[in-house]
């Protein structure tokens, strides 16, 4: 299982602390916070990985999978939205790498920053954003029975004529 209950708060807290704005999950029906703020949506929870699980001494088998998150930064001010998006992408690409690694997350790549403006009745909501591809572990307990030793046997090759 992917530990989203630990990964999600670590990513959101680290990014929010760096930017100094609130980061919320997008596409909710609750009232939005005051500008500026950021949103995230997990667009791909666990991308396919045709590899095999790694067996570890702690009894946990791990498979590295890709998780894709979309980040957008909203403001009433166009420039502020762009600046937040640029700073956020820089955090994922460089400044925040140690923070993420300490929480078991690797930001593998980021996409271009693109305009995502919305029109709200008579005015625009300025929004710019990008996607981040994370590497995360899908972990499962290894339930294989082991008895702590490997039985050996003497094998003598037979000769055929």
Language model regions located:
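Soluble non-cytosolic domains of exported or imported proteins
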Residues: 2-6, 75, 79-82
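Oligomerization/assembly interface segments of phage tail-like spikes and tubes
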Residues: 61-79, 125-136
